[in-house]
Amino acid sequence: AYENIVLPVVLDNQDIDEDDVNDLLESLQIEHCRDKFPEQMSGGEQQRVAIARALITHPSVIFADEPTGNLDAVSAETVAKMLTLAASKYQQTIVMVTHDRQMAEYADRILTITDGNVTGGVGV
């Protein structure tokens, strides 16, 4: 998982911040996956590795399509809290697609889209 998480940093020819990697592994509860290959991890663990990979470079905008779709309720809540913390800590904007109303509750603004049209919104 480690190589997967740091790949964007390596591709950008940046130095790897080991503290940052360790913080993500711990926050997403995947420390035990550090030396595992994808086939050795559950779907939920793979999803959290993908989220860590998205967060490692601290982009100003994160696009997340069903980021908790393959996770159990506890893991989904952990990921939601991590995304919220990252957005606050690094002043990131997160654009998220979700069908999970509980996950949507973490948002500052919610748009409801039906058949490609905005049909409602909260906090807009």
What spans do the regions from the language model cover?
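Helix N-cap at the start of a conserved alpha-helix in ABC-type nucleotide-binding domains
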Residues: 73-75
